[in-house]
């Protein structure tokens, strides 16, 4: 078929069948197969044409709001990088759909979602989108959810993940917590403090996982825990460090906020520090006493596209683990290189 010029009108069935030496019934079956593969298209009242090109499959990435790409954190940008790379290499299109104009799940722009259907391949990152999951089910989309491990099951998430068209990639935070505490111990530190965002949230698995790791690696030690607020106020951050780290005679601190990283670098340059969930060495101003965890979101994004396009039952539910890096061994890595 590809020996014919794209856009060419094929002969009428009776003539084409004679030319090919087959019956008209056989020809009709063959044309039906070619049409299903987008190699020909039938135009009622005109005939059958050779297609100009085979339509690419489309990957749809849902975003909370139109500005999410500009505002997004490193992990989302790296995830998108992997998705774009996969779409380019696997010859499919990528579209992004903003769910809400105001970044509010109760203010959904439904008209942006109405084109989703049984042929749609949809990527979802995080639990923010759960209120539209029933809509995605009703639309019969094929969905892949990338999400972090939680302390408790999130509502009826398990029911969604049992559906045959739903896939998920889980980020193992328990493993991350254990690896970070173990790395701290192997580096010679024995009295950590944890000043991290979200430690007071009930469904956050990290407080439980971090305490379990400390109980196993540092039996008898009860580390200070403080659920840090997102702030750039240096005096507030210093006050928290003095209270929970310095006065408690801690020899290492774990953080997950960039503002704490900056303040520690300026005011406590000799304080060993573990940074959770860091995805790029770019703008990471560590020293030889710093280490960090990183999930390979470029790889995760790439494999998410592969799963939607070609995945099978055996790969529907996957668990990803992080790696731990010392800043002193990673500082020569080029920006953006993973």
Describe each region flagged by the PLM:
Residues 8-44:
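N-terminal helix-turn-helix
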Residues 12, 46-58:
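Short, cationic-aromatic polyanion-contact patches
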Residues 54-121, 214-221:
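Amphipathic helical "hinge" segments at domain boundaries
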Residues 60, 118-126, 144, 193-197, ...:
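Periplasmic-binding protein-like
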Residues 127-176, 277-290:
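Flexible loop/hinge segments that line or gate small-molecule binding clefts
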Residues 158-194, 237-242, 293-314:
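Hydrophobic alpha-helical segments within soluble ligand-binding/sensing domains
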Residues 178-218, 315-332:
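An alpha-beta-alpha
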Residues 242-338:
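Flexible loop/turn connectors
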